[in-house]
């Protein structure tokens, strides 16, 4: 592995650890109290040891798996395999023709789309990290202006 790839992996893992989402959870998740049947439960609960020490390790493992999958797809495309490209948000695919068909429920793409439900989400608050990573990649001449 050359030094540029090693630095890119190091920056990716550093960003994963810095952007850990454990603080964004806002307390303990899941059903609490009587919703879990807490009234008839035993007072002492044995908790199994966690498989990983923190969510950062899971996120780093997921990022590494995603990068490996992307590298496999890129290698397959470079080898000349004929993969079908997924339709973007503004493009119509083969499955979208039933919306205007007679007997359909008449709902358009914007009603049940991912973008319609998540467009109100605000920024995550990690704005300082993007210029830092962009500057590091620009210094390595890996990011084209």
From Swiss-Prot:
Residues 1-24 form the signal peptide. The keyword Signal applies. It comes from the Eukaryota. One of its GO terms (cellular component) is nucleus. Coiled coil: none annotated. Residues 120-145 form a propeptide. This is Shadow of prion protein. It comes from Ovis aries. Belongs to the SPRN family. InterPro entries: Shadoo. GO terms for biological process: protein import into nucleus. Prion-like protein that has PrP(C)-like neuroprotective activity. May act as a modulator for the biological actions of normal and abnormal PrP. N-glycosylated. Mainly expressed in brain. It is found in: Cell membrane. It holds the Pfam family Shadoo. One of its GO terms (molecular function) is nucleic acid binding. Glycans are attached at residue 105. Keywords: Amyloid, Cell membrane, Glycoprotein, GPI-anchor, Lipoprotein, Membrane, Prion, Signal. A lipid is attached at residue 119 (GPI-anchor amidated serine). It is a lipid-anchor; GPI-anchor.
């Amino acid at each position: 592995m050359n030094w540029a790839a090693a630095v890119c992996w190091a920056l990716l893992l550093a960003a994963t650890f810095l952007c850990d989402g454990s603080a964004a959870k806002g307390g303990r998740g899941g059903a609490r109290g009587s919703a879990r049947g807490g009234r008839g439960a035993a007072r002492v609960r044995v908790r199994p040891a966690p498989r990983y020490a923190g969510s950062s390790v899971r996120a780093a493992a997921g990022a590494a798996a995603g990068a490996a999958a992307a590298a496999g797809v890129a290698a397959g495309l470079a080898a000349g395999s004929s993969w079908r490209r997924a339709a973007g948000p503004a493009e119509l695919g083969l499955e979208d023709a039933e919306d205007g068909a007679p007997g359909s429920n008449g709902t358009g793409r914007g009603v049940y789309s991912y973008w319609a439900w998540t467009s109100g989400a605000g920024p995550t608050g990690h704005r300082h990290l993007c210029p830092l990573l962009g500057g590091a990649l620009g210094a390595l001449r890996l990011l084209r202006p």
